[in-house]
Curated annotation (Swiss-Prot):
Comp. bias (Low complexity): 1-19
Descriptive protein name: Serine/threonine-protein phosphatase 2A 56 kDa regulatory subunit beta isoform
Protein source organism: Oryctolagus cuniculus
GO biological process, one term: signal transduction
Subunit note: Component of the serine/threonine-protein phosphatase 2A complex (PP2A). This complex consists of a common heterodimeric core enzyme, composed of a 36 kDa catalytic subunit (subunit C) and a 65 kDa constant scaffold subunit (PR65 or subunit A), that associates with a variety of regulatory subunits. Proteins that associate with the core dimer include three families of regulatory subunits B (the R2/B/PR55/B55, R3/B''/PR72/PR130/PR59 and R5/B'/B56 families), the 48 kDa variable regulatory subunit, viral proteins, and cell signaling molecules. Interacts with SGO1. Interacts with AKT1.
Length: 500
């Protein structure tokens, strides 16, 4: 009887075993972008590896693994692995249907066997297993036909060979998770070259493939201790090329999710290598255009670092202020959400180091004409822990934001924002009424002085304009006086015929 693959076999981001949960994107950015641009239609692509070879041998069904005696099991397993190494053309839906079905049935059987049968993974089958996996998954990814591909709006190019490829990934995953799996044997085949090719597959446009790759790479990182430093190094290279060269790599979110779990397991004190990764890679990642695709995972990694070492807070906040978006309001909302997550875990001793520059930026966000940016900034005062930090440092935070709050409360076009500002001002008044009154008086005096200077400036310009007009009139009068004798002289010359 044919063994079916369980429908729940595809790993998903929140429920992938061994991966730390990542905050949902709506916690960071509660204002989804709605675009009127029509999503581009999905087109079929095929990797170069899956081009059909007309001279390939026709597949015939082999006996079921469960029907053969134990003495013949491993020989039949090797034959089935070789059978599953035959590739088919999935762009032609009707080509070699029998062979495709034979391979699919064999893959289903292998998945079931390696997941439930003990003693099947002996040393001689390891090279056959890795060879079959490599032949199926390692391929040249097709270039995207759309250079302006937007993962949020455009349909990805799905892998046509997924009916077979999914089963190969599922087999690989169960192979790594099997109780009989021996890393000491597998490390001869799962080496640095294998890992590098595995990482290159993260650029696949098919999100189903990237989900499997994420879980598999995490298992490889956990099983092969000797490859851990190499995996981190190659991830660094991918991120740096993404930031400074191409700004295109489809698997950034998945790699960051893996790294979030890895960071969570870092031993203390943190190594210099890990701190440099935060400062030189994670912080500059905030500058790329496609930040919204992976920001939730990136923010999670940053917060994980700060929970490990609070002294990194100042570097992180100043880095965020350095890359703070100037023209993209959607990114501003995401930055504000990440700052709130950081403030949720910040130590009071670290808060005093960044409070002034941070809340000056928050004040600029409050004054934004885009109401979502202003609203997101004002929501800081709804967070009890942040409010307690502000109250303890009211003498610094209040002067940094008071002028902006007072002015925007009089001028902002959105009444919701005005109401929120009134609530914030009321909170400040209750925190420190004396300081609030002093700042109010100082603000009004400053405004009066500004108005006085504006009047003086206006009077000065008005006086200069009057002086210019008088000089202009005086010049015209002098010119008229000089021209009068000449006008009297011209008729006399005409009367004498020009003779002296």
């Amino acid at each position: 009887m044919e063994t079916k693959l369980p429908p729940a076999s595809t790993p998903t981001s929140p429920s992938s075993p061994g991966l730390s949960p990542v905050p949902p994107a709506d916690k960071v950015d509660g204002f989804s972008r709605r675009s009127l641009r029509r999503a581009r239609p999905r087109r079929s692509h095929s990797s170069s590896q899956f081009r059909y070879q007309s001279n390939q041998q026709e597949l015939t069904p082999l006996p079921l693994l469960k029907d053969v005696p134990a003495s013949e099991l491993h020989d039949l397993l090797s034959r089935k692995l070789a059978q599953c190494g035959v590739m088919f053309d999935f762009l032609d839906c009707v080509a070699d249907l029998k062979g495709k079905e034979v391979k699919r049935a064999a893959l289903n059987e292998l998945v079931e066997c390696v997941g439930s049968t003990r003693g099947v993974l002996i040393e001689p089958v390891y090279p056959d297993i890795i060879r079959m996996i490599s032949v199926n998954i390692f391929r040249t990814l097709p270039p995207s036909e759309n250079p302006e591909f937007d993962p949020e709006e455009d349909e990805p190019n799905l892998e046509p060979s997924w009916p077979h490829l999914q089963l190969v990934y599922e087999f690989f995953l169960r192979f790594l998770e099997s109780p009989d799996f021996q890393p000491s044997v597998a490390k001869r085949y799962v080496d640095q070259k294998f890992v590098l090719m595995l990482l290159e597959l993260f650029d696949s446009e098919d999100p189903r493939e990237r989900e499997y790759l994420k879980t598999i790479l995490h298992r490889v990182y956990g099983k092969f201790l000797g490859l851990r430093a190499y995996i981190r190094k190659q991830c660094n290279h991918i991120f740096l090329r993404f930031i400074y060269e191409f700004e295109h790599f489809n698997g950034v979110a998945e790699l960051l999710e893996i790294l979030g779990s890895i960071i969570n397991g870092f031993a203390l004190p943190l190594k210099t290598e890990h701190k440099q990764f935060l400062v030189r890679v994670l912080i500059p990642l905030h500058s790329v255009k496609s930040l919204s695709v992976f920001h939730a995972q990136l923010a999670y990694c940053v917060v994980q670092f700060l929970e490990k070492d609070a002294t990194l807070t100042e570097h992180v906040i100043r880095g965020l202020l350095k890359y703070w978006p100037k023209t993209c309001t959607q990114k501003e909302v995401m930055f504000l959400g990440e700052v709130e997550e950081i403030l949720d875990v910040i130590e009071p001793s670290q808060f005093v180091k960044i409070q002034e520059p941070l809340f000056k930026q928050v004040a600029r966000c409050v004054s934004s004409p885009h109401f979502q940016v202003a609203e997101r900034a004002l929501y800081f005062w709804n967070n009890e822990y942040i409010l307690s930090l502000i109250e303890d440092n009211c003498h610094t935070v209040l002067p940094a934001v008071f002028g902006t709050l007072y002015q925007v409360s009089k001028e902002h076009w959105n009444q919701t924002i005005v109401s929120l500002i009134y609530n914030v001002l009321k909170t400040f008044m209750e925190m420190n009424g004396k300081l609030f009154d002093e700042l109010t008086a100082s603000y009004k005096l400053e405004k009066q002085q500004e108005q006085q200077k504006a009047r003086e400036r206006q009077e000065l310009w008005q006086g200069l304009e009057e002086l210019r007009l008088r000089r202009l009139q005086g010049t015209q009068g002098t010119q008229g006086a000089r021209e009068a004798p000449l006008q009297r002289f011209v008729p006399q010359v005409a009367a004498t015929g020009g003779q002296s």
